Amino acid sequence: SLCYDHGRTPWDAAYAYILLPNRSAAQTAAYSAAPDAEILANTPQVQAVHFKNAAVTGLNFWQPSANPVAGVSVDAPASVTMREDEEGLTIGVSDPTQLNTGKIRITLDRAVGKPVEENP
């Protein structure tokens, strides 16, 4: 088992970790030596990670953000997943607060074609 001692009154503490279920100590050490995950942002406003081998990026914006992270900005709190492959770009969007009753507008830092499929 593992634990991270946050202390009695942590303030502005920052850390990142990845869960590796069913991995041995040797497998965990090997992953640690050459991690697949790249932390793109880890602030109170946004957390973002990119998994290189899977070409997947996950972002949690806890507030609107005009400053792009991984080429993405949002006008409301949003959880965004992106995967790009030879078929194109797949994006998933949801509200991490579960309070939004309207829309979430995401802006990408590049041109994309018309959506092939979307949910209203």
Task: Spell out what each predicted region is.
Residues 1-120:
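Terminal accessory/anchoring regions of large secretory-pathway or extracellular enzymes
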